[in-house]
Every structure is written in structure tokens, then in C-alpha cells.
């Protein structure tokens, strides 16, 4: 990952991913995020991970099919749904969406595992997206929800 990323593991919340090296790290803003990484120079450029309990759903597919969920997120953010993909990460279905707003670009991943909804959100300006998209794709692709 070119030395730009380093491993981050949250054993209490049960996930791991690569995070940007040298960015500011903020722990838990309840109801908003569990951890946030923020670019030192461009504070609007962030990576956030949040978890919330789910009572009955065991898969992100319980939220709806991929296009429907993607369209809902795009509408709620007044953004265009550029791409929607699903993948299997160690037995858990993950939905990934690329959204483009008027001023920003967002890569978002959703997964339900062990009674929790996991959300990984990466945001940067549209101007910076061409330079940052590979970094963000690597971060989202590195996300693994599992017990430790």
C-alpha cells in the first residue's frame, strides 16, 4: 500500500482495516463514529468507521438489494450514485458505493456481522478524488468485520 497506510484494529468493536498514516485520529463521537481519521492539511478529507447494533438482521441484504440501498444513500446525500458493488469478506456480505456530490466524492461500505451494522465512510473533495481514489479503495477493501 505504498507506505501510505497502516493497520488499525479495534478489538472491542470487532473490525480491522488500513488507515492513512500520519492523519489525525479521533476516538468515538457516540452516534456519529467510532473512529475518524482526518487529513492534517485538508480537514474535510476523512475516513470514518461506525458501528450500531441491529436486532434481527444478519446480512446487509436485509436493508434491501444493492441498487435500492445505493439509491437511498445517494438521495439522502443529494449525490449521484456512481458505482455500487457487493463482495464477500470472510463470509460477510459487504455493499460498497461510490457517490459524487456537488463538492465531494464519497466511498461508503456497509456490512452486518455479529449483530452490528458496520459503516466505513471515506470523503474528499471532487478536486482531490483523482489523487485519492486508489487510497480510499484500498482502505475500504481492507475492511474486515470479525471477532478478535
Task: Describe the function of each predicted region.
Residues 1-4, 24-119, 124-128:
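Conserved polar/disulfide-associated segments of primarily extracytoplasmic proteins
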Residues 17, 21, 71, 134-141:
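Solvent-exposed, polar/charged alpha-helical surfaces in well-ordered, non-transmembrane soluble domains
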Residues 140, 144-148:
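Short amphipathic alpha-helical signal-transduction/dimerization elements
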Residues 4-16, 133:
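Short aromatic-glycine motifs in intrinsically disordered, low-complexity regions
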Residues 12-30:
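Proline-anchored loop/turn motifs at beta-strand termini and strand-loop-strand connectors
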Amino acid at each position: 500500500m505504498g507506505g501510505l497506510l497502516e493497520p488499525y484494529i479495534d478489538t472491542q468493536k470487532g473490525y480491522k482495516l488500513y488507515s492513512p498514516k500520519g492523519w489525525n485520529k479521533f476516538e468515538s463521537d457516540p452516534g456519529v463514529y467510532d473512529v475518524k481519521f482526518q487529513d492534517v492539511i485538508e480537514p474535510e478529507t476523512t475516513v470514518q468507521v461506525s458501528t450500531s447494533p441491529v436486532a434481527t438482521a444478519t446480512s446487509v441484504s436485509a436493508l434491501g438489494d444493492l441498487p435500492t440501498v445505493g439509491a437511498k444513500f445517494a438521495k439522502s446525500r443529494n449525490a449521484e450514485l456512481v458505482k455500487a458493488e457487493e463482495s464477500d469478506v470472510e463470509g460477510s456480505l459487504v455493499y460498497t458505493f461510490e457517490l459524487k456530490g456537488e463538492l465531494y466524492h464519497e466511498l461508503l461500505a456497509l456490512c452486518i456481522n455479529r449483530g452490528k451494522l458496520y459503516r466505513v465512510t471515506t470523503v474528499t473533495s471532487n478536486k482531490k478524488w483523482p489523487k485519492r481514489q486508489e487510497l480510499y479503495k484500498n482502505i475500504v477493501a481492507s475492511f474486515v468485520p470479525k471477532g478478535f
